[in-house]
Each structure stands twice: as structure tokens, then as C-alpha cells.
Amino acid sequence: MKYQQLENLEAGWKWTYLVKKWKEEEAITCHIDSSEAEAAIQSLLTIEHEPTKVIEWIDKHMSPALENKLKQAIRAKRKRHFNAEQVHTRKKSIDLDYRVWEKLAEKSQELGSTLSDTIEYLLSESNRTETVTKTVSDIRKDLSDLLD
């Protein structure tokens, strides 16, 4: 699925990504000399709110090893950004114990569906079971009232 590219917004994401990698002490520049690398990083830190300069900095100074990783990170960020605009594509996350996740994954494979679809199915089955149990209980009560 294609998503519209927003140059200014994505330049900000790229800047954030590069600074994060730099703080994690990864080599983000193509420079071998540490003084050149440090100067390039200092110039990156000063151009946060200047998208065109960020793009120029990337073209001139970024390590080739980071190129694919940056593209993948931006593609994922772009997808999350556009999916968050609509309720039905917005993703939510939940924390599950490993054993619960394992059982859910097993049930998903049995049903041949996604984890989300499996959760939805199990909830609807649970609701149906509650409804049937309540109906049976009501019938038993009515029957016992009639017999008394």
C-alpha cells in the first residue's frame, strides 16, 4: 500500500532517528576521522527545524550502512502515521503473558486467522455462551415455577 510522502514531516522523523542512533553511540556519519564526524553531528544537531538542510545533511554526511535502516524506519513511521488517522486502521497494543500469547497463537492457527480475529471470535463465543446460559437458567426457573 502506498502512502503519501510528506517531505517536511519525514525530514523531522529522519532527524529524530539519526539523533537517536547517535545517542545510542552508533556511527551515523560516513566520516572516518572523528573530528569530521563530530563536526557533522554538531551541524546535524543545529538544523532540527530546517527540513531541507536535514535532507542535504543526510545526502552529504550519513553513513551508507544506515541508508536502508533509515528508509525502513521512515516507511514504517509513514504507515503508522496514516493508519492512525482512521479508527479502523489505528493499531492498539496490549501486554500478554507469554503463556496467554502462546494459547492465543495456537487457537489462531487452528482457526486460520489473525490474533485480532481470534480475540474477536472468542469474545463473541463468550457472549453467545452467556446468552444461552441465561436463557436456559430462565427456562429452568419458569419450569420450576410451573411445577410448584
Swiss-Prot record:
It holds the Pfam family MatP. It is found in: Cytoplasm. The gene is matP. Gene3D superfamilies: MatP, N-terminal domain (1.20.1270.380), Met repressor-like (1.10.1220.10). GO terms for biological process: cell division; regulation of DNA-templated transcription. GO terms for cellular component: cytoplasm. Belongs to the MatP family. Keywords: Cell cycle, Cell division, Cytoplasm, DNA-binding. It comes from Photobacterium profundum (strain SS9). This is Macrodomain Ter protein. InterPro entries: Arc_rbn_hlx_hlx (IPR013321), MatP (IPR009390), MatP_C (IPR035375), MatP_N (IPR035087), MatP_N_sf (IPR038339). Signal peptide: none annotated. Homodimer. One of its GO terms (molecular function) is sequence-specific DNA binding. Required for spatial organization of the terminus region of the chromosome (Ter macrodomain) during the cell cycle. Prevents early segregation of duplicated Ter macrodomains during cell division. Binds specifically to matS, which is a 13 bp signature motif repeated within the Ter macrodomain.
